[in-house]
UniProtKB/Swiss-Prot annotation:
It comes from Shigella sonnei (strain Ss046). Pathway: Purine metabolism; GMP biosynthesis; GMP from XMP (L-Gln route): step 1/1. InterPro entries: Class_I_gatase-like (IPR029062), GATASE (IPR017926), GMP_synth_C (IPR001674), GMP_synth_GATase (IPR004739), GMP_synthase (IPR022955), GMPS_ATP_PPase_dom (IPR025777), NAD/GMP_synthase (IPR022310), Rossmann-like_a/b/a_fold (IPR014729). The active site is at C86 (nucleophile), H181, E183. This is GMP synthase [glutamine-hydrolyzing].
Length: 525
């Protein structure tokens, strides 16, 4: 019998902050399971979840507006600790009898708060001391409204000159509010505050660890599928690879992995996937060479969104054909991860704006003939990588830069042709190889090459040539929501450009993309 790793759990209610998923990831890093739900949950749902504690997230709205979100009243009646962050603190204050006002100026950025009263939340935690020995905390503020009066049964724990109630607490009820973001790294002691709340105040044990997550997932897979056969589309990406390894550990040869080579992969990627999973790990793999079929379907198409849909559609067609050749397969496995689940829920409630169609879920058959197995659906990406390491997958593969689901289909601008893909593959491989050699690969968040369907004149020897252009792209980001272009050294860029132009016959010019996000997206299409 495996240990119940969900026994202690934190419920995070989402009021719309860009940092809310980061709060959840921080709680998981502390070894405690948590889930992220929309703020408008019912009392019955909270009772059913049975949390050890509740966190109210930040959000972009103003509590002073009539129809702004509120925490369900049951949150304050459930008898469990509650931690309000930024907007979460403001709605807590307002709902429990305090007062919030719109501020004339938004407070955004670094601040130092002075701890003026003892509290279990920050006891013994400090970044510095005042002249008279009071603890100071370096924090990150991001708010427009501010609490101007706290509820009568609360005390002020910390304040700044412009924010008199930076931390408030009701120790008896174990209610806490902070007017800053403990989840971001700029709040230097933020993790210690979250740990204090989750581990000490809520008394949650650290049961959520990679080894225990694997044991739990294996047990659940076996319970779900029994002796049935399972099919999985293996792409070689992190999610499908870790899904394959978990299923292989749980059901062995009852798993069949279908690897569709769409001709839109990186240099030598197909061979690497087959070698690693087939030869090294001994998984049962069906290799489907389908380059011609994908490129034929993409012929003449220039629109990025249409290209995505075509690639998704053809993959499903090819995958379905292979599935029909297998006998008695009753389950389809997918590498769905927790952010996909959150995103789908947000889309269903109309609370998210789709910028690009999601690569992973673009074209599932509307009428599933098989049951669905999703062993990663509770996990964030960083957790997937950690359990991948525990399962024996190589670090370099798990921590590779992101690669889009449509592959080179969205890195060749406009119409996708085999000639363009072949040139791009080789140019991109040189860029990545040089980044690794210069010890720059892990210093940037994502780097890749884009093929531009324009010819540019070049000089080779005594002659002129009229060949294609590629752009190098490298960005630095924490969350991929915003990004800065990477300031790579000029001599490095010169070396990469020289190698590409000299070694890849057909490319005459290399440019470097210096666009940030926003306004540009990270991928070109």
């Amino acid at each position: 019998m495996t240990e119940n790793i969900h026994k202690h759990r934190i419920l995070i209610l989402d009021f719309g902050s860009q940092y809310t998923q980061l709060v959840a990831r921080r709680v998981r890093e502390l070894g405690v399971y948590c889930e992220l739900w929309a703020w408008d949950v019912t009392e019955a749902q909270i009772r059913d979840f049975n949390p050890s504690g509740i966190i109210l997230s930040g959000g972009p709205e103003s509590t002073t507006e009539e129809n702004s979100p509120r925490a369900p009243q049951y949150v304050f009646e459930a008898g469990v600790p509650v931690f309000g962050v930024c907007y979460g603190m403001q709605t807590m204050a307002m709902q429990l009898g305090g007062h919030v006002e719109a501020s004339n100026e938004r407070e955004f950025g670094y601040a130092q708060v002075e701890v003026v009263n003892d509290s279990a939340l920050v006891r013994g935690i400090e970044d510095a001391l005042t002249a008279d020995g009071k603890p100071l905390l370096d924090v990150w503020m991001s708010h427009g409204d501010k609490v101007t009066a706290i509820p009568s049964d609360f005390v002020t724990v910390a304040s700044t000159e412009s924010c008199p109630f930076a931390i408030m607490a009701n120790e008896e009820k174990r209610f806490y509010g902070v007017q800053f973001h403990p989840e971001v790294t700029h709040t230097r002691q933020g993790m210690r505050m979250l740990e204090r709340f989750v581990r000490d105040i809520c008394q949650c044990e650290a049961l959520w660890t990679p080894a225990k997550i694997i044991d739990d997932a294996v047990a659940r897979i076996r319970e779900q599928v029994g002796d049935d056969k399972v099919i999985l589309g293996l792409s070689g990406g992190v999610d499908s690879s870790v899904t394959a390894m978990l299923l292989h550990r749980a059901i062995g040869k009852n798993l069949t992995c279908v690897f569709v080579d769409n001709g839109l992969l990186r240099l030598n990627e197909a061979e690497q996937v087959l070698d690693m999973f087939g030869d090294h790990f001994g998984l049962n793999i069906v290799h489907v060479p389908a380059e011609d079929r994908f490129l034929s379907a993409l012929a003449g198409e220039n629109d990025p969104e249409a290209k995505r849909k075509i690639i998704g559609r053809v993959f499903v067609e090819v995958f379905d054909e292979e599935a029909l050749k297998l006998e008695d397969v009753k389950w389809l496995a997918q590498g769905t991860i927790y952010p996909d689940v959150i995103e789908s829920a947000a889309s269903a409630t109309g609370k998210a704006h789709v910028i690009k169609s999601h690569h992973n879920v673009g074209g599932l058959p509307k009428e599933m003939k098989m049951g669905l197995v999703e062993p990663l659906k509770e996990l964030f990406k960083d957790e997937v990588r950690k359990i991948g390491l525990e399962l024996g997958l190589p670090y370099d593969m798990l921590y590779r830069h992101p690669f889009p689901g449509p592959g080179l289909g969205v890195r060749v601008l406009g119409e996708v042709k085999k000639e363009y893909c072949d040139l791009l593959r080789r140019a991109d491989a040189i860029f990545i190889e040089e980044l690794r050699k210069a010890d720059l690969y892990d210093k940037v968040s994502q780097a890749f090459t884009v093929f531009l369907p324009v010819r540019s004149v070049g000089v080779m020897g005594d002659g002129r040539k009229y060949d294609w252009v590629v752009s190098l792209r490298a960005v630095e980001t924490i969350d991929f929501m915003t990004a800065h272009w990477a300031r790579l050294p000029y001599d490095f860029l010169g070396r990469v450009s020289n190698r590409i132009i000299n070694e890849v016959n057909g490319i005459s010019r290399v440019v470097y993309d210096i666009s940030g996000k926003p306004p540009a997206t990270i991928e070109w299409e």
